[in-house]
Every structure is written in structure tokens, then in C-alpha cells.
Amino acid sequence: MQFSSSIRQFLDKKRIVEFTKIQQAVFKLWPFQNIIGIAETGSGKTFAYLLPLLDKINTSLDQPQAVIFVPTKELQWQIINILTEIKKYFKTFTFATSFSSKAQLIVSLLNEKYLFTSKVRYVVFDEIDMFLEQSSIQQWLECVHLFQKAKPLFAFFSATLFNQQLQIIKKQVINTKVINLHPKQWIHPLVKHFVVHLNTENRFSGLLALLKHHQNQQIIVFCSNQKSLKQLTQLLSNNNISFGSIYGSLTYQERKNNFTKATNNKLKLLVVSDLFSRGIDLNYFSVVISWDLPKIDSFYIHRSGRVARLNSWGRSYLFWNDQNQSKLNKLIAKGIKFQNVSLTSNGDLKFLTENNQKTTKKPLSTLQIKKIKAIKAKYKKVKPNYKKYQKQQIQNLLINKKKPRSWKNF
């Protein structure tokens, strides 16, 4: 794709001489038709939709022509920072975060007030799967229907988009071309996954061991809810461990300050909620730790995707316990391979090789448990070799159990 001289100057300044696979694929179709782009985290999806969009904006027209909807403030700030850099190479390009502005490009959250304008020709939803969650899908539908009055071209992007979500989009926006460069959506080739096994329930001892092991690297710790986040930050404070944090209940300025520190390499340890797992580029961070597992399985992929961006390696750790065993097994069933890690008596990490890997039994379903109980109930009267027959029946039951449901990837 041939870009304008302004964009070419920006690319030259940033020494971008080669485009990623998702960018090359998107440039052929966008913004000439509706598209859905699916590619792994850190693959360059933002530039994939943003550069062609900027090429089509009429900078002599002082009104909104394109809208980018994002799910979090942090992703909004990141895109604004990128646009601030690009604007230096344009004479009259304007952008804003509010529809009250006459800016040519609006970067907005879905829950902010948005106004319909007939001049909007391009609408992008970044991290679209978050808009399709139960809490926000109705608002998303209303937004799409409103902007469809102007007959714009739509673009939807995410690293994880499954069949049911894909059908929702295609039902609302017809003639949509799917670009799927991430068929194995649960697997990132540059992320190594680890399970930390503890002899006690004290996860904090495991966290301290990880911080010690990666003391020369920058680390993100994810928490699935406000309660666990506050508990962890209190533990870190009590142990005089320096950290920054980003989560929903912080003030706007606190979130903005810590976000700026993290993106400018001013923080060694960052504790965040899952709000921070989407689309954020942190070039200096290489380790992700899940203090607990997210409620939605796919969020784990987005957590681990904060590292291993643009061809750099990353590590993702989680802690094993009885409570998250079933969630862990779901991730394993999706094809994610975990290396087991144990904690030595002196508080160091021991990475287990394939020969001495710990094994974790997959949990039985409620139906399987009922069937096993029924098998055992048959043998109330003791007969010769009854234990052998009983064991064989149970083994046959487990061998013939249904495979876990797999998502259809596109």
C-alpha cells in the first residue's frame, strides 16, 4: 500500500521498513470494505487499522470522519500517544477523545457520550471481544446501529475471537471479510508458560521467589478482582517492595501517572487488574505473573500477551492450588503447555525438566462421579476379584469420556 508523504515520513523516522503479516493482510482490504482482523497479541494490529485510516482522512474537513472505540482508558491513552507522534508529520490533522470536538478522528470509550454524524466514514472497534461481553453487548449493538445510518466501513480487531462472537458481528455488519492469522488462538509461540507448585498455601512466598529470580527484569502481576488486588498490594507494602498499580477504582490521575511510568520504563513491578490486559504495549516488561486466574479463560491469553510483543520472548507464571485446578485444566485442554516449577526449602525456584515434571490429574465431571459411585455400589457383596473388575470398569469409563469442547477458530 502506498501511503501519503506524511505517513511515510513518520515510518522513516521510526525506522519501520517492514510490515507485519497482519498489517500486510489488512492493508489490502481496509478501509475499502468491512473487515474482522484476528491476530496474536503484539502482532501490530493497531498500525494495521490506524495507518490506512489516517491515509483516508480529509484533513481539510473540520469534523469527525473516523471513530476508534476502545474498551479501556489505558488503551485510549496509548493510541492518543501514537497519534501525538504521527501528528508532527501532518499540517492540519486533528484528533480528540470527545465527540463534542470537531476533530477529524475520535478515540472513544463506549460508555462515553457519542454523537452521530453523517460524515463518519470509518468505525473501528479494537479488542472487539470485550464489547461483546454480556455487560456491554447491548450498548455495542446500539452504537453499531446508530453509526450504520451513515453507512460507514467497519473494522473489528482482537487476538481472541471465537465462533459465537464472530457470528454476532457478521449478523450486525454484513459483507464482512475475516482475516484470521491466529487460528491457534490459545497459543503464542514466543510465550513460555509455567505453573508454580507450592508446599503451602502461601502464594506470597512463591511471588517473592519469582521476584528474586527475575530481579533484573520488569514484571506485571495480574489480579482478577479488587479484593485480591488490594490484599496483594497490602502485602507488598508491608514488605517494603516498591511497585505501581493500575485498576478501575483509582482516580483518573493515579491511573494516568502509573500508566505513563510503566510505558516510560519507570517501574520495575506493576500490579494491575484485567483492565490492563488488553492491547497495551509495554516494551520493557518480559514477565507476567497471575496472582489468581481470571474468570474468563481467554483473558489469560491477553494477560500473557503483555509480554512477547513484536518478536521478543516472554514468560507467564501462575500458581497451582485446588481452587484453580479446573481452570488450569481448561487452559491445558486448549493446547497451552505448562512447565512445572517448585519452590526449594531456601526459597529458590526449581524448574522441572520433562523427566521430572509433576503431573496433575484432570478433574472428573459430575456425571462421571455419579457413574463411578454407581459402579462401586454394584459391589456391595464381596466376590472373588471384585476389586479388579471394579477398577477395570472405572478405567473404561474414563477412557471413553467425552473430549473437552473445543472452540471453532477462524
Curated annotation (Swiss-Prot):
<dbReference type="Pfam" id="PF00271">
    <property type="entry name" value="Helicase_C"/>
</dbReference>
<dbReference type="GO" id="GO:0016887">
    <property type="term" value="F:ATP hydrolysis activity"/>
</dbReference>
<keyword id="KW-0694">RNA-binding</keyword>
<dbReference type="InterPro" id="IPR001650">
    <property type="entry name" value="Helicase_C-like"/>
</dbReference>
<dbReference type="InterPro" id="IPR014001">
    <property type="entry name" value="Helicase_ATP-bd"/>
</dbReference>
<dbReference type="GO" id="GO:0003723">
    <property type="term" value="F:RNA binding"/>
</dbReference>
<comment type="similarity">
    <text>Belongs to the DEAD box helicase family.</text>
</comment>
<keyword id="KW-0547">Nucleotide-binding</keyword>
<dbReference type="GO" id="GO:0003724">
    <property type="term" value="F:RNA helicase activity"/>
</dbReference>
<dbReference type="Pfam" id="PF00270">
    <property type="entry name" value="DEAD"/>
</dbReference>
<protein>
    <recommendedName>
        <fullName>Probable ATP-dependent RNA helicase MG308</fullName>
        <ecNumber>3.6.4.13</ecNumber>
    </recommendedName>
</protein>
<dbReference type="InterPro" id="IPR050079">
    <property type="entry name" value="DEAD_box_RNA_helicase"/>
</dbReference>
<feature type="domain" description="Helicase ATP-binding">
    <location>
        <begin position="26"/>
        <end position="179"/>
    </location>
</feature>
<feature type="binding site">
    <location>
        <begin position="39"/>
        <end position="46"/>
    </location>
    <ligand>
        <name>ATP</name>
    </ligand>
</feature>
<dbReference type="GO" id="GO:0005524">
    <property type="term" value="F:ATP binding"/>
</dbReference>
<keyword id="KW-0378">Hydrolase</keyword>
<feature type="short sequence motif" description="DEID box">
    <location>
        <begin position="126"/>
        <end position="129"/>
    </location>
</feature>
<keyword id="KW-0067">ATP-binding</keyword>
<dbReference type="InterPro" id="IPR027417">
    <property type="entry name" value="P-loop_NTPase"/>
</dbReference>
<feature type="domain" description="Helicase C-terminal">
    <location>
        <begin position="190"/>
        <end position="357"/>
    </location>
</feature>
<dbReference type="InterPro" id="IPR011545">
    <property type="entry name" value="DEAD/DEAH_box_helicase_dom"/>
</dbReference>
<dbReference type="GO" id="GO:0005829">
    <property type="term" value="C:cytosol"/>
</dbReference>
<keyword id="KW-0347">Helicase</keyword>
